Amino acid sequence: MAGSVLMGVGDKTADAWREHVGGALAKMKIDDTSANDGAEMGPVIDGAAQSRITQTIASATATGAEVAYNGAGRVPSRGFFVGPTLLDRVAPTMSLFQDEIFGPVLSMVRPKTLDEAIATMNTLGYGNGATLFSASGAAARQFTREIQCGMLGINIGVPAPMALFSFSGWNQSFFGDLHVQGIEGVMFYTRQRVVLSRWDKSYVRAQGW
């Protein structure tokens, strides 16, 4: 998603995720995706976006975030590239956590409990999609009931539904009166009409109609 946050509940879980994700980023192929079919990640949209993203990373590290993986040295020299970056121990007060970055940056926050994780996520002004990876049905039920978000996944990487269901962001991730896709998407193009009728023999004309 545009603002990507990874929460490992408990240090043991967070450490495992840090190692796994950092290893995956180190293998990622970065290049011009229009010229190289093997490239997995291309540049950002323009120089302004490149500058904004790198400044956000610098601000977070200057205020306490740890660089778990820095891919800046692996990007092509030409183009508006930003290397894939994993930042650990990000504080919920940082702009990296609060704002949508729209760049290849993953933030890690380390809540001690699921309750703390949900409470922290619910401080965000956005509410597009969130996923819980867990073997616990109780944790999944709590997550789906308490998280303030429109699209939820349980053990699913990206909780974006098919067109049969609404793309249902909440809070600042929702603009307008109706969501796109699903029945709400159909209703956007629908003009409703209500007809009230009553029939009995007193309305029958002599001609029979």
Regions found by a protein language model. Give the residues of each.
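Conserved C-terminal structural/oligomerization subdomain of aldehyde/semialdehyde dehydrogenase
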Residues: V9-K12, K29, T33, G73-R74, ...
